[in-house]
């Protein structure tokens, strides 16, 4: 695994929730920066978009690396660091014996994390953290493009 971590900031959301949604991610490694975004024109949820962002970012990495992943979603951070192993052990049922919501994405995130050494961090959203703010802007762009307010429905840009 790489000694210099890849730093990833992610965000996702919907307008309204549920409704069309977008996700964004900023990946940094040394002097390299990659911006990613996408969206869903169909009805989705904030939580699904918050999960999609780290999945897409981790799946974009071409080799196993150390990752510091920042999210403003306690749902995502707690889910992957505290709850997912119990859900899996219980047949993807919650402690209340209800099916886990978004199980398809939790399983995909779990698989994406397995390729890398991922350390998860929670950050307060809209608090002036540059790459978190950029991930939010990218999620908005993904939403706008998904509903046809701009030209395409998913993209990647390099800075």
From Swiss-Prot:
InterPro entries, per database record: RNase_H (IPR050092), RNaseH-like_sf (IPR012337), RNaseH_domain (IPR002156), RNaseH_sf (IPR036397), RNaseHI (IPR022892)
Q: Which domain of life is it from?
A: Bacteria
Question: What UniProt keywords are attached to this protein's entry?
Answer: Cytoplasm, Endonuclease, Hydrolase, Magnesium, Metal-binding, Nuclease
What compartments host this protein?
Cytoplasm
- S-S bridge residues: none
What Pfam families has UniProt attached to this entry?
A: RNase_H
Q: Name one GO molecular function term.
A: RNA-DNA hybrid ribonuclease activity
The biological process GO terms on file are:
DNA replication, removal of RNA primer
UniProt keyword Plastid present:
no
Name all RNase H type-1 domain ranges. 2-144
Instruction: Give the GO cellular component terms, alphabetically.
Output: cytoplasm
| Enzyme Commission code(s) on record | 3.1.26.4
SUPFAM superfamilies given in the database record: Ribonuclease H-like
Q: How is the cofactor bound?
A: Binds 1 Mg(2+) ion per subunit. May bind a second metal ion at a regulatory site, or after substrate binding.
Q: Which residues form a coiled coil?
A: none
List residues binding Mg(2+) 2. Answer: 11, 136
* Cofactor(s) annotated in UniProt: Mg(2+)
Q: How does it assemble?
A: Monomer.
Name the family: Belongs to the RNase H family.
* Protein name (record): Ribonuclease H
**Species of provenance:** Mycolicibacterium smegmatis (strain ATCC 700084 / mc(2)155)
Gene designation? rnhA
């Amino acid at each position: 695994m790489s000694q210099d971590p890849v730093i990833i900031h992610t965000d996702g959301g919907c307008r309204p929730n549920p409704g069309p949604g977008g996700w964004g991610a900023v990946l940094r490694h040394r002097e390299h920066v990659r911006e990613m975004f996408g969206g869903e024109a169909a009805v989705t949820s904030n939580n699904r978009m918050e999960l999609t962002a780290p999945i897409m970012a981790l799946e974009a990495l071409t080799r196993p690396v150390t990752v510091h992943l920042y999210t403003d979603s306690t749902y995502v951070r707690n889910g992957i660091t505290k709850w997912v192993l119990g859900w899996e052990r219980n047949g993807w049922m919650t402690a209340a014996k209800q099916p886990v919501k978004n199980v398809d994405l939790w399983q995909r995130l779990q698989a994406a994390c397995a390729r890398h050494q991922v350390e998860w961090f929670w950050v307060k959203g809209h608090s002036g953290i540059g790459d978190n703010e950029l991930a939010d802007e990218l999620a908005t762009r993904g939403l706008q493009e998904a509903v046809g307010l701009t030209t395409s429905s998913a993209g990647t840009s390099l800075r």
